[in-house]
């Protein structure tokens, strides 16, 4: 820190700047000034002098700041004077002082007064201003709390309205979910884990506040899953010919003899089982929008697999 511009803007630094620029501010005698021990004025002044010994930021009444040696020597004298007075007060040595009349003073060299900057009012003024500032801060805090309280009440009211609206919309969504959800396959000969307690996964996004209500609603309306009877299978050979076939995936109950001789009596099975043909034709109609072209019926029957 080489100039006043490098200092941090604080109350203490402003007071030091005032001491540097305000020539009407009186100096004090460090030998005889009555420092307040309760507010630790000696220790506070000593600390400031210790910080300022490397910087010419104090206006000393008996020397020039342009003379570096004189300025430093004077500052050291002020610092040592405060240190001695602080030690006397700390150890209770007031009665151990020498009688000034018993000393043979040399008027040419001995100094009986030592004037320096008044650094005691820096902390005292700050303490006097702080209660007023605290009152202002308390008023601002009260106003802030009241404003926050009003805003919080308005916010809570708006949130309650939004939650009620979301609950009503969720009730309507549950009705739509009844149409979206599909029952499980009635042809299944084994029980499925999806039949009793599962729900349809096509649920629109809802607010977190009404998530518990939605879970209760879904428990009241258990839904089942539905699977297609068959899936489309496309094959492309090396010549680019496209062949489509339907594979029956529904777990229709068949006899063991039928499953054992399925491949041997493949064509005979289609002649005698019209129900299976109708089921596959319905599934083929569902996938007609995804075909690459018109396929002949003989290709369809030749490539189908039923199990």
Curated annotation (Swiss-Prot):
GO CC term, one of those recorded: cytoplasm
Compositionally biased intervals (Basic residues): 255-272
Residues annotated as signal peptide: none
An example Gene Ontology biological process: cellular response to glucose starvation
Residue span of region Disordered: 254-278
Family, as annotated: To yeast YOR062c.
Listed name of the protein: Uncharacterized protein YKR075C
